[in-house]
């Protein structure tokens, strides 16, 4: 997995979001300002800044007049920096985090399903094309999902040692919230589970009364007479001791009250620790918390607005949420199964997951979820895995931006644990089937190396056909400029080249001498025409004219198509 991710990180040029995150990370460390990329909390970008600290990055102008996207391009291409080195430096901490999350997957699944279950879960996580693809990039999706997953694992561990693990769960939850606000819907579930874990721990520590078949602990030795018979204790003494003992009902009520108070304290304490972590992250960027609410920022009102107002987080965090709500009010274009559309499709994300998840993994996810539900002793563990997966998926399905399975990147973590429980099914054919499905996942993942971002499973034609069904970060996120430059230099030297590119990279930096076909009449566009597949998916009328007389002859990274016209 490490080899696959490092190879991917070295080969890919900037995706659409990465320059913004890198520039913001540098502004954090150089200027201690929160003004860029406020729609996302700072922690993920501070993690990237840890990698950038090993590079000699030039000083950014505090008065730079451009947008955050322009600042990202300026940092990578206009400031004398090496974009390959900067990107790799920012991506390496994310890669290390992704590998560490794999160990958490192993530990969680081993706790629930034993060593074999842990290995099954680790194998599914390690071969997940989505995890490899997005864990190789300087983005926020995998860090946020992994930190939240770690929080749920620690809450699970808290069932046995609450005073050690529940505070750590609060730290992990706060870190997740300080990376992406989209983790907020999981907070009620986690604090309730913290209370449940404390309840279980307190109940397990209470002494259990002896049953009729069990003698009391340390029964008193009876004195014997010279004839060997026991002297019975005086009846009056026994009655007095019984009268002095508290009633059984009072003892039970006292124990229950203690458990309730401890559970409530665990829930509140875990939440307060998470809140403190978010504040500490913002203070780490700017100890003075200098922030001005942008003009014209709409307030949603209603329950959503009330929830934002009541969040115990810095104003910059709450305003970032309002910016996200503003973005959700827009109408976006989407592309699914070969058809473009405008607006929102509630089933887009489940359909995209079915396309981009290995078939064996889908089968094991489903089997694992059913196993956790139908095996009684696993139902408690299911509370720590399945509800959070369902809640986050349902919330993601309501979003207006149909841009990729990265919005559900938490599923390969949580459902890997569920899949590991199939190891507890002691049926010969089930064990053989599980082994074959894991092997199928591994083969499918290895076959797509190193093109993990545009992966799709065999039922939908494999990686080469992903662009026929999906777009944007599912297949073409602007990541293949370096591969395109090499392809043009090797296979099409000296030919007239035209380029329609979607991304944040600068083609000229990579030696791509291509003209813009939109600047001349259609009948003057002849030669090699390179088009990002995301542009083809949502082709404008002008682009459709260009494609009418164009013949596809080649592809680059399964994200760009080369035509001859």
Which residue stretches match the model-derived regions?
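Multi-pass, polyprenyl lipid-linked donor-dependent membrane glycosyltransferases
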Residues: 16, 89-99, 116-127, 131-150, ...
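Interfacial juxtamembrane loops and adjacent helix segments
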Residues: 30, 34-93, 290-342
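Membrane-interface transmembrane helices that cradle and orient dolichyl/undecaprenyl
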Residues: 110, 151-166, 198-201
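Transmembrane alpha-helix segments characteristic
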Residues: 121, 365-367, 376-397, 546-550
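Short hydrophobic alpha-helices at membrane interfaces in multi-pass membrane enzymes
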Residues: 158-174, 255-261, 388-389
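Signature aromatic-anchored transmembrane alpha helix within multi-pass, membrane-resident enzymes
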Residues: 188, 268-271, 373, 377-378, ...
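C-terminal luminal/periplasmic domains and tails of membrane-associated envelope-modifying transferases
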Residues: 227, 249, 253, 337, ...
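Hydrophobic, aromatic-rich transmembrane alpha-helices
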Residues: 352, 357-379
């Amino acid at each position: 997995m490490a080899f696959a991710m490092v190879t991917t990180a070295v080969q890919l040029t900037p995706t659409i979001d990465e320059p913004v995150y890198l520039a913001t990370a540098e502004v954090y460390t150089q200027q201690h300002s929160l003004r860029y990329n406020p729609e996302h909390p700072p922690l993920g970008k501070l993690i990237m800044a840890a990698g950038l600290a090993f590079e000699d990055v030039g000083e950014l102008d505090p008065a730079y007049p451009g947008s955050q996207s322009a600042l990202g391009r300026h940092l990578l291409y206009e400031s004398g920096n090496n974009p390959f080195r900067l990107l790799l430096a920012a991506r390496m901490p994310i890669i290390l985090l992704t590998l560490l999350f794999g160990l958490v997957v192993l530990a969680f699944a081993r706790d629930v399903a034993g060593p074999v279950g842990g290995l099954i879960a680790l194998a599914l996580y390690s071969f997940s094309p989505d995890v490899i693809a997005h864990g190789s990039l300087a983005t926020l999706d995998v860090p946020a999902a992994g930190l939240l997953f770690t929080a749920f694992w620690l809450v699970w561990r808290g069932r046995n040692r609450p005073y050690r693990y529940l505070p750590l769960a609060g730290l992990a939850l706060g870190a997740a919230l300080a990376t992406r606000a989209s983790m907020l819907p999981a907070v009620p579930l986690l604090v309730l589970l913290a209370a449940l874990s404390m309840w279980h721990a307190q109940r397990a520590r209470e002494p259990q009364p002896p049953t009729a078949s069990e003698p009391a602990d340390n029964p008193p030795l009876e004195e014997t007479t010279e004839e060997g018979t026991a002297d019975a204790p005086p009846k009056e003494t026994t009655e007095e001791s019984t009268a002095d003992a508290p009633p059984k009902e009072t003892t039970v009520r006292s124990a229950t009250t203690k458990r309730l108070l401890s559970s409530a304290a665990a829930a509140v304490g875990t939440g307060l620790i998470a809140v403190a972590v978010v504040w500490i992250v913002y203070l780490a960027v700017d100890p003075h918390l200098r922030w001005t609410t942008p003009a014209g920022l709409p307030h949603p009102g209603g329950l959503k607005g009330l929830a934002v107002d009541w969040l115990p987080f810095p104003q910059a965090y709450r305003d970032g949420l309002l910016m996200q709500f503003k973005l959700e009010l827009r109408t976006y274009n989407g592309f699914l199964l070969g058809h473009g559309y405008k607006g929102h499709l509630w089933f887009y994300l489940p359909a995209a997951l079915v396309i981009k998840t290995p078939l064996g993994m889908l089968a094991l996810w489903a089997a694992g979820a059913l196993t956790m539900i139908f095996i009684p002793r696993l139902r408690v563990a299911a509370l720590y895995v399945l509800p959070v997966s369902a809640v986050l998926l349902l919330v993601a399905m309501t979003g207006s931006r149909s841009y990729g399975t990265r919005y559900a990147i938490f599923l390969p973590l949580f459902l890997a644990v569920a899949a590991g429980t199939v190891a507890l099914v002691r049926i010969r054919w089930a064990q053989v089937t599980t082994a074959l499905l894991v092997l199928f996942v591994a083969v499918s993942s290895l076959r797509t190396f190193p093109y993990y971002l545009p992966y799709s499973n065999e039922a939908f034609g494999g990686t080469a056909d992903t662009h026929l069904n999906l777009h944007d970060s599912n297949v073409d996120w602007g990541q293949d400029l370096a591969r395109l430059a090499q392809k043009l230099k090797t296979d099409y030297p000296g030919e007239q080249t035209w380029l329609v590119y979607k991304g944040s990279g600068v083609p000229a930096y990579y030696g791509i001498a291509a003209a813009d076909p939109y600047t001349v009449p259609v009948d003057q566009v002849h030669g090699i025409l390179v088009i990002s597949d995301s542009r083809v998916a949502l082709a404008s009328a002008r682009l459709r004219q260009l494609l009418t007389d164009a013949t596809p002859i080649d592809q680059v990274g399964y994200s760009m198509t080369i035509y001859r016209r």
